[in-house]
Amino acid sequence: MWAYADLCNRLFQAVNQASQFKDLKIYYFHNCFYDQLFTAPQCKWEDKVSTEWVLHNLKPEYKVIVVGDATMGPAELLEPGGTLDYDHENDKAGIDWIKTLKKRFTSAVWLNPLHEKLWDYDASTRTIQIIREQFPMFPLTVQGLEAAIKELRKGEA
């Protein structure tokens, strides 16, 4: 995902400047989010913020856009302790954090920088399929972002 950090930053800054969002908050993670998110793309521990804090301090009405390729080792997504950060043990599986976020923020989508043709490619993209069961997934393109925003605005007056 590091290859897409600059693209994501430019894309969301442009959206923010176009007044698409009243309040834009950006958090980062590597592969999957667990009990910590980060306020800088390098995902250093000095830039961490508790995922629980985010869940409890942002209103449920927030629109959430998750950006990631959704590819990782299945253990990273499905097992407690699956994080690749050997200095930190996650007690809750990544999929459980994903479900918790989706339950808290019902208007949530996932933008994926991988070409859509690769989403159903083979067993190595199994994690994409699992995440797609939780979030509507769109390509990380201008058209994908437009479709994602349309999805987020469903049900608005």
Residue ranges, per PLM feature:
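An amphipathic, basic-hydrophobic helix/alpha-beta surface used to engage anionic
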Residues: 1-21
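Short, basic, helix/turn surface patches
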Residues: 2-3, 54, 138-143
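A short acidic (Asp/Glu
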Residues: 4-9, 35-40, 75-79, 119-124
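Short amphipathic alpha-helical segments and helix-helix/interface helices
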Residues: 12, 16, 54, 94-99
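A generic membrane alpha-helix/interface feature
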Residues: 17, 41-43, 87, 130
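A generic structural motif
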Residues: 19-24, 104-107
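Von Willebrand factor
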Residues: 23-65, 71-77, 95
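Von Willebrand factor type A / integrin I
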Residues: 60, 70, 74-157
